[in-house]
Amino acid sequence: MAIERTLSIVKPDAVAKNVIGKIYDRFESAGLKIVAAKMKQLSRAEAEGFYAVHKERPFFKDLVDFMVSGPVMIQALEGENAVLKNRELMGATDPKKAEAGTIRADFAESIDANAVHGSDSVENAAIEVAYFFAASEISSR
């Protein structure tokens, strides 16, 4: 099994609900280690840059507006098959379609306010982790 790193963001809706610790418990219980973390109020430029891949999609403006609506908790997770494991923990993008017991089923309100972001591939994970963390801010353990 490959040790991977992935990016996770606890979005403004979940931060406002004060469930960061409950979400972190899901990561750690699944064998993922938090190797970097910071709370941050994203600027519009940061959110637009991070989600640039969606720039031409109709939901882009609403997504950016949501991501700058309050602080987010950003973390790099590390572990065996971290990308897939985190995606399984998150559940489907639409919380109404997410399996019971997943983060989105338990903490998300809607497809827009869906509690968490997670990298969708090992390649994107490397890009996303580097977007928010310098190598010196990451401590493998």
UniProtKB/Swiss-Prot annotation:
Named cofactor requirement(s): Mg(2+)
Keyword rRNA-binding in record: no
Catalytic activity: a 2'-deoxyribonucleoside 5'-diphosphate + ATP = a 2'-deoxyribonucleoside 5'-triphosphate + ADP; a ribonucleoside 5'-diphosphate + ATP = a ribonucleoside 5'-triphosphate + ADP
Gene Ontology terms: biological process: CTP biosynthetic process; GTP biosynthetic process; UTP biosynthetic process
InterPro entries documented for this protein: NDK-like_dom, NDK-like_dom_sf, Nucleoside_diP_kinase, Nucleoside_diP_kinase_AS
Active site: H117 (pros-phosphohistidine intermediate)
Matching Gene3D superfamilies: Nucleoside diphosphate kinase-like domain
Subcellular location, principal: cytoplasm
EC code(s) of this entry: 2.7.4.6
Localization: Cytoplasm
Binding site for ATP: K11, F59, R87, T93, R104, N114
A GO CC term assigned to this protein in UniProt: cytoplasm
Gene Ontology MF terms in the entry: ATP binding; metal ion binding; nucleoside diphosphate kinase activity
Pfam families, per the entry: NDK
Enzyme class, UniProt record, top EC level: transferase
Keywords carried by this UniProt record: ATP-binding, Cytoplasm, Kinase, Magnesium, Metal-binding, Nucleotide metabolism, Nucleotide-binding, Phosphoprotein, Transferase
Function, in words: Major role in the synthesis of nucleoside triphosphates other than ATP. The ATP gamma phosphate is transferred to the NDP beta phosphate via a ping-pong mechanism, using a phosphorylated active-site intermediate.
Family classification: Belongs to the NDK family.
Complex formation: Homotetramer.
Protein name, UniProt field: Nucleoside diphosphate kinase
Organism annotation: Chromobacterium violaceum (strain ATCC 12472 / DSM 30191 / JCM 1249 / CCUG 213 / NBRC 12614 / NCIMB 9131 / NCTC 9757 / MK)
Lineage: Bacteria, Pseudomonadati, Pseudomonadota, Betaproteobacteria, Neisseriales
Designated gene of the protein: ndk
